[in-house]
């Protein structure tokens, strides 16, 4: 009652739509066939106009005949389908086999004869030019062939220098056994310990203004050679002794 009274008393106006003809003229609604508006039918329904009735009489069927014919039809269909599937698969396999390239004996023989060429094509070694090599010389030597570079200087740590100074304070010359022990203790090579002690001895002699040991040994060897020459000459005929200044 409330809804009906509301609709009667209210100023509600029903919407007015244009007729379908205007929509069809403006191509809003496509024209449909009369079958479009008919009731839906079962899928088993056959229209008389589409499927005309045949004139020959329909044969009678029994349950056994229907079952036997059905089995035969199914077997025939399955046989036909299996043959069709086999025929479809066989050309595909043939196509796949044809696509795969086959290595000819000529190519195999070439690869066997030239394994180095095949490796070169796979991985090329980087080219090192002469200007890329490090040269530790003051002037450019044209005859330099890029041999072993100059050894870099060893950077001793403070702990290593302290231990070497302690050892030098007690022993300026090391035996081979002691040198090996120090090298193992300080994680250095025997050569590095030997060079450090040589440089430290040179510095100590320079600080104490002592003559170089090598220069002293050279001068002593020259004096001994002179003495041997004088003694080998013997006395002169006039009986005078040889003068050292004349020699």
Curated annotation (Swiss-Prot):
One of its GO terms (molecular function) is DNA-binding transcription factor activity, RNA polymerase II-specific. Residues 217-233 have a biased composition (Low complexity). Residues 206-247 are annotated as: Disordered. It holds the Pfam family Homeodomain. The keyword DNA-binding applies. It is found in: Nucleus. PROSITE patterns: ANTENNAPEDIA, HOMEOBOX_1, HOMEOBOX_2. CDD domains: homeodomain (cd00086). One of its GO terms (cellular component) is nucleoplasm. A motif (Antp-type hexapeptide) lies at residues 128-133. Sequence-specific transcription factor which is part of a developmental regulatory system that provides cells with specific positional identities on the anterior-posterior axis. This is Homeobox protein Hox-A4. It comes from Heterodontus francisci (Horn shark). The lineage of its organism: Eukaryota, Metazoa, Chordata, Craniata, Vertebrata.
